Amino acid sequence: MKVAIALAKDGVGIYPGPFGHAPAYAVYEVEGGACRELERVENPYAHEEGGNKPEKLKNLLTGTALWVGRRFGHDDPHHSHHPAPPVPHRKTAAKTLEEALKELGCASTT
């Protein structure tokens, strides 16, 4: 399964804000306890608000079956974002990429 994980600017931490505002994503192939990094994707939409941003992210992160981040959408019920992303998502309490990969069941990473 191809997974996109929201990264902080340092590339090691998990972005603490909404998934769509992350500066970049680590894309991994997760299979049978092994996780292989495929690429890092810069987010050109990080500063955009509302509109069709979820669809733009879906196109940016083509082929991902799961998005992992600290938050999805905004807590404000009047915010213009869609209530849920167009790809299945998983909230994480992980603070680092390594912790998030462990939550996904990764026994080994490459």
Regions found by a protein language model. Give the residues of each.
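Non-catalytic interface/targeting segments
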Residues: M1-N52, G63, P88-T110
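Mid-chain, well-packed structural core segment of small domains
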Residues: L57-P88
